[in-house]
């Protein structure tokens, strides 16, 4: 594991430890801190998808990596849960101004986490790392929202499935959640109905032969 603890001054380590220790029992609403006692510079959290967004109902894991120049330089943020979002790259990297040009050394971890949660409510297509998501957000919101909801259902919806693994391809909850009421769901339903009708016809013929 690449840890930056040994590269940070003792007073910075104490500052980070104090803030994480304060945040863990009292985090911002919809955010849970997952402390890493072995490496305080690797801050992992889970964020609830905000209501009224395509991410609602999802639980998204992410992490902040505090580099050797922290807090003079901003932490790097990564989503560990796959997400379809203009400001999140394919490898999970998060693009938000507070982690770049708007960073100030006095901004704490709480502020960063709240900013990232806000990004789920108000994506910024102007600084897109996922160009397709940014384009759809501007040109076809319904398609963007549909793609984002599908990714949420597949990768981030475990909390509402009552013990069933949503990533298990054999899970009926996974298939139902992923397909929803879209054309794929209708196609599968149509195929199933045809098979049932054919089976009924065969059974009827067999019954008539017996008479």
Swiss-Prot record:
Recorded GO MF terms: ATP binding; ubiquitin conjugating enzyme activity
Listed EC numbers: 2.3.2.23
Swiss-Prot/TrEMBL keywords: ATP-binding, Cell cycle, Cell division, Nucleotide-binding, Transferase, Ubl conjugation pathway
Listed GO CC annotations: anaphase-promoting complex
Chain residue ranges for the region called Disordered: 157-211
Superkingdom, natural source: Eukaryota
Keyword presence, Cell division: yes
Reactions mediated catalytically: S-ubiquitinyl-[E1 ubiquitin-activating enzyme]-L-cysteine + [E2 ubiquitin-conjugating enzyme]-L-cysteine = [E1 ubiquitin-activating enzyme]-L-cysteine + S-ubiquitinyl-[E2 ubiquitin-conjugating enzyme]-L-cysteine
PANTHER family (UniProt xref): UBIQUITIN-CONJUGATING ENZYME E2
Similarity annotation: Belongs to the ubiquitin-conjugating enzyme family.
Task of the protein: Catalyzes the covalent attachment of ubiquitin to other proteins. Acts as an essential factor of the anaphase promoting complex/cyclosome (APC/C), a cell cycle-regulated ubiquitin ligase that controls progression through mitosis. Acts by specifically elongating 'Lys-11'-linked polyubiquitin chains initiated by the E2 enzyme ube2c/ubch10 on APC/C substrates, enhancing the degradation of APC/C substrates by the proteasome and promoting mitotic exit.
Name of the protein: Ubiquitin-conjugating enzyme E2 S
